[in-house]
Regions:
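N-terminal signal-anchor module of multipass membrane proteins
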Residues: 1-117, 410-412
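C-terminal ends of transmembrane helices
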Residues: 44-50, 124-135, 172-182, 262-270, ...
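Central hydrophobic cores of alpha-helical transmembrane segments in multi-pass inner-membrane proteins
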Residues: 97, 116-130, 147, 167-175
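Structural signature of hydrophobic alpha-helical transmembrane segments
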Residues: 106-120, 157-166, 229, 243, ...
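Generic transmembrane alpha-helix motif of multi-pass integral membrane proteins
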Residues: 146-156, 261-267, 329-335
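Loop-to-transmembrane alpha-helix initiation sites
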Residues: 164, 185-190, 319-325, 348, ...
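Long hydrophobic alpha-helical segments that form multi-pass transmembrane helix bundles
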Residues: 179-261
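Short, basic, low-complexity termini and linkers enriched in Ser/Thr/Gly/Pro
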Residues: 297, 302-312
């Protein structure tokens, strides 16, 4: 009954927003709200198309659902990391059976994340709506995912004004100047993170993150992440199990491999994300990690000139790279972006392998920035069209050769 009432109300005011109506200049904005509430009844007008039950809106919502486990765990981990160093936390952390402590950690993290999500969506959607009105285009649902991801991949104490600048930069420079959703060649969420990293490096260096020293963070300390400890030449104090679960300092929602794996399962089952890219990123990272493990047994003095802490890095078991930093999150939710990734099947393997290789290589060799996943994905975003071009050109040459052989055989 409520749905029918909303439908009738929308149909009643719709003439005001169509051509010739009082608010025709707001047609794009009206259509955005209408299509968000209901599936549009428009069909394609020309060309042959494959009918599919999943449109862009459902695809974006499915990705958001896949992000929910990482978001919920990230909220809880914000409260948990605060509780570990707080002097006035109201509930003891005496195990998973303490439901009150678990819920309070989740509530504490929710209160920290809510303003960041609000700023991300308000700023980003405002710019999206403005560009849609200027261009007289419909508002696409692409920012549903981007606005959700950006707060997940930055430190929880990123000032809201810095977050707003990063979102604006990502939407305008990373997407709209190239034509909007589907036309961008760089992942907008990573563009936002890159903006913060290069504009405010002390807050995005990847080695230390904020941990509250009292309940509301009026006094605070910083805690080293596993990657930060490695950058200092120290083996990570957290166990592999802790890093796998995610109970470690880090970016807001990137720490739990379990939560990320749940989202990856949903994306793979629904066919939204490419399993080739996910698997190849993992294989590339493992290959590079094993290569460094082999180099650690050779005792080459030349390697120490690249990074003074290199010996600690290269002796680290290769699978640790999957558990630290944003490797897992990037492999599942960033590298698989269908707009910025390679499109051909062979290209996806090449694209993913190079991301994994460069991510681990940048971590180990680059002493200035412990995390390399962001830079690796952005680099391969730039080369994805070239990879596809080379793969397609190779396929064309092979087909031409087969056609030539066939024609010669027929002539005989």
């Amino acid at each position: 009954m409520k749905t029918n009432s909303i439908r009738r109300f929308i149909d009643k005011i719709k003439p005001n927003f169509t051509e010739g109506g009082k608010f025709a200049w707001l047609q794009s904005t009206f259509e955005a709200f209408e299509t968000f509430a209901f599936t549009p009844n428009r069909v394609t007008k020309s060309g042959c198309h494959v009918r599919d039950a999943i449109d862009l809106k459902r695809t974006m919502i499915m990705v958001v659902i896949a992000l929910v486990p990482a978001m919920l765990f990230g909220m809880w981990n914000i409260g948990y990391q605060t509780a570990l160093h707080s002097t006035d936390w109201p509930y003891p952390l005496d195990g998973c059976h303490n439901v009150a402590a678990l819920l309070y950690c989740l509530w504490f993290g929710f209160l920290r994340m809510l303003p960041m999500l609000a700023v991300s969506y308000i700023v980003g959607l405002s710019i999206e709506f403005a560009f849609a009105q200027i261009r007289h285009h419909e508002v696409n649902e692409g920012f549903l995912v981007t606005g959700f991801i950006i707060p997940m991949i930055v430190p929880v104490t990123t000032p809201l004004w810095q977050l707003a600048l990063a979102v604006a930069f990502a939407v305008i420079i990373g997407k709209e100047v190239f034509g909007g959703t589907g036309m961008n060649f760089l992942n907008p969420a990573l563009v936002a993170r890159a903006f913060l990293f290069f504009a405010y490096p002390t807050r995005m260096s990847g080695d230390n993150v904020w941990i509250a020293a009292d309940l509301w963070g009026t006094d605070a300390i910083t805690g080293a992440t596993p990657l930060g400890e490695l950058a200092a030449g120290i083996r990570p104090t957290a166990s592999a199990l802790d890093m796998f679960i995610g109970t470690i300092p880090g970016s807001t929602c990137e720490t739990s491999v379990i939560a990320i794996a749940l989202g990856a399962t949903l994306l793979l089952v629904t066919g939204i994300a490419s399993w080739r890219i996910m698997l190849s990123v993992i294989l590339g990272g493992g290959l590079m990690g094993l290569t460094f493990n082999v180099l650690s047994t050779l005792n080459l003095p030349q390697l120490s000139t690249l990074n003074p802490q290199l010996s600690t890095y290269i002796q680290l078991p290769f699978y640790y790279h999957y558990l630290m930093g944003g490797f897992a999150f990037g492999a599942v939710f960033m590298a698989t972006d269908p707009v910025t990734a390679a499109q051909t099947n062979i290209g996806k393997w090449i694209y993913g392998l190079l991301i994994g290789i460069f991510a681990v290589m940048l971590r180990v060799i680059n002493p200035a920035y412990p995390e390399g996943m962001m830079l690796a994905i952005l680099l391969m975003n730039c080369f994805a069209p070239l990879i596809d071009h080379c793969v397609i050109a190779r396929n064309i040459r092979m087909r031409q050769k087969r056609a030539l052989v066939t024609s010669k055989a027929s002539a005989k």
